[in-house]
């Protein structure tokens, strides 16, 4: 069993990107997702608030929520997947919860979070995409 765990750790250590910015719950982020359409490849941005973060090594995910024409749209992004082309933290917010699921029942201005003024990390771009 110990050899199996060592093998899994060795594989995951190769897939984990160490230069990813520190993404926290409450952050307003823009994630560029690489989409293959026929023989063309393009990057589609998805901008929204991080409402949850699941830490599991190479399987870590973030759930991002945005409101589009009055309808809430949520999407779960695996942080270390090759389809994530870039990641940018646009704004930080002061939150006192680990999961912001209460934002699902709110609309309009009620979904705003109190901004935290601190230096933001650099834009991260996947070097394998270019």
From Swiss-Prot:
GO (cellular component) term, any one: ribosome
InterPro entries: Ribosomal_bL19, Ribosomal_bL19_CS, Ribosomal_bL19_sf, Translation_prot_SH3-like_sf
Molecular functions (GO terms): structural constituent of ribosome
UniProt entry tagged with the keyword Chloroplast: yes
A biological process term (GO) from this entry: translation
PROSITE patterns assigned: RIBOSOMAL_L19
Ribonucleoprotein is among the record's keywords: yes
Gene3D superfamilies: 2.30.30.790
Annotated family: Belongs to the bacterial ribosomal protein bL19 family.
Protein name: Large ribosomal subunit protein bL19c
Organism for this UniProt entry: Chlorella vulgaris (Green alga)
């Amino acid at each position: 069993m110990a050899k199996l765990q060592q093998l899994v750790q060795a594989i995951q250590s190769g897939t984990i990107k160490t230069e990813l910015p520190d993404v926290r719950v409450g952050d307003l982020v823009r994630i560029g997702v690489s989409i293959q359409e026929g023989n063309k490849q393009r990057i589609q941005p998805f901008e929204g608030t991080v409402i949850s973060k699941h830490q599991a090594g190479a399987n870590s995910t973030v759930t991002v929520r945005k409101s589009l024409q009055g309808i809430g749209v949520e999407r779960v992004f695996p942080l270390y997947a090759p389809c994530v082309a870039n990641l940018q933290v646009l704004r930080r917010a002061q939150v006192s919860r680990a999961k912001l699921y209460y934002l699902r029942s709110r609309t309009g201005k009620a979904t705003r979070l109190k901004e935290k003024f601190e230096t933001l990390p650099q834009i991260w771009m996947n070097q394998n995409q270019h």
